[in-house]
């Protein structure tokens, strides 16, 4: 897809020749670090932007190797769609299971399993169907709302942008067409108003000495001037006066818009506070259960130890009481304790 919309092809062709390839290694479009290009693997998260006449895209190319799993979590944390690459010759591996599980854990609403390198299995429908059955069985134990399978060959471009003439048995859309038609607007929660305050705006000028605005990104729900809101954790209630952006005032704001909200009353609000509806407020708790993806290889998560915990823009200290169970990523079975 980037091949069709990137101006970096000449550089990629040159590096491919330097590495002795007889073909253009398109993975170099997203492998930006020198170490990545030298080793032929993805290490860091590479963000690339492109657009078609129908939609704008941001690709977060994340590493597949186990030692760089934390970078994969970073890239997937804000994604609307997860593309899980599966080698047609190998089927589901520990790596692909790990990626599918993490995408599910992070709540990515759409998952597309791209069965790649179909050219190396003679475009076999039976190979594709076998992998689809294996992945579908695994996905039944995940929280995946929308699961799609596409057979393709990234090297030759089959089913990437154009339909493949080598796989007439596949009646689905090619990858780019599927992404263009994917409906993501309904994935946003427009009911439960949650506006975490990121920054308090207090201009230091005589003309605006009484101005106080609260900047942040709308996490969920819809905000409008005149709406009643409650400030947590303090519990004060007030009314939204205006909603502002750099382009002017708004009549409403919804996810993932970044805005400045002003209130009719002067209330002590700081970074980390949250605006919500009085009748639909989140619970304020001292104790919670959480599913954690632990990344620190040098130290284990230890019950009784104090850690920093970050929720939107608020940071606090927390003590781990106990570990109820661990999850085997390959089988998804729970290991107690």
Question: Positions of the model-derived regions?
Answer:
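P-loop NTPase switch module centered on the Walker A-proximal segment
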Residues: 1-67, 79
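Conserved Switch II/interswitch segment of TRAFAC-class P-loop GTPases
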Residues: 55-57, 62-68, 77-100, 108-129
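Canonical P-loop GTPase G-domain recognition
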Residues: 109, 121-187
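Active-site phosphate-binding and catalytic loops of NTP-dependent enzymes
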Residues: 18-24, 31-43, 138-147, 180-193, ...
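Residue-level signature of catalytic and energy-coupling elements of molecular machines
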Residues: 1, 12, 40, 61, ...
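Accessory interdomain/linker segments of ATP-dependent helicases and helicase-like nucleic-acid enzymes
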Residues: 155, 172-211, 215, 230, ...
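C-terminal effector/interaction modules appended to NTPase cores
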Residues: 52-55, 203-337
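Solvent-exposed alpha-helical segments within well-ordered globular domains of core cellular machineries
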Residues: 7-10, 14, 31, 48, ...
């Amino acid at each position: 897809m980037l091949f069709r919309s990137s101006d970096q092809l000449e550089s990629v062709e040159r590096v491919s020749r330097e590495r002795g390839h007889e073909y253009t290694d398109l993975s170099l479009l997203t492998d930006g670090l020198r170490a990545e290009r030298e080793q032929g693997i993805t290490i860091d998260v590479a963000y690339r932007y492109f657009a078609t006449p129908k939609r704008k895209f941001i690709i977060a190319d994340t590493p597949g190797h186990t030692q760089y799993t934390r970078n994969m979590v970073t890239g997937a944390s804000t994604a609307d769609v997860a593309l899980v690459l599966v080698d047609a010759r190998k089927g589901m591996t520990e790596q692909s299971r790990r990626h599918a599980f993490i995408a599910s854990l992070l709540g990515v609403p759409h998952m597309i399993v791209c069965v790649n390198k179909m050219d190396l299995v003679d475009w076999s429908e039976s190979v594709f169907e076998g992998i689809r059955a294996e992945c579908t069985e695994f996905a039944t134990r995940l929280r995946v709302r929308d699961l799609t399978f596409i057979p393709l060959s990234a090297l030759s471009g089959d089913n990437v942008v154009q339909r493949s003439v080598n796989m007439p048995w596949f009646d689905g859309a090619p990858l780019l067409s599927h992404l263009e038609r994917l409906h993501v607007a309904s994935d946003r929660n427009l009911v439960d108003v949650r506006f975490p305050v990121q920054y308090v705006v207090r201009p230091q000028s005589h003309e605006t000495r009484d101005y106080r605005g609260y900047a942040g990104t709308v996490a969920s729900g819809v905000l409008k001037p005149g709406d009643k809101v409650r400030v947590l954790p303090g519990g004060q209630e007030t009314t939204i006066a205006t909603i502002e952006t750099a382009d002017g005032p708004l009549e409403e704001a919804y996810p993932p818009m970044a805005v400045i909200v002003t209130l009719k009353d002067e209330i002590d609000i700081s970074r980390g506070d949250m605006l919500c509806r009085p009748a639909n407020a989140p619970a304020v708790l001292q104790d919670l259960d959480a599913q954690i993806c632990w990344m620190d290889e040098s130290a284990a998560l230890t019950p009784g130890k104090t850690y920093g915990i970050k929720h939107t823009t608020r940071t606090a200290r927390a003590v781990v009481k106990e570990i109820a169970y661990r999850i085997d990523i390959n089988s998804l079975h729970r290991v107690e304790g």
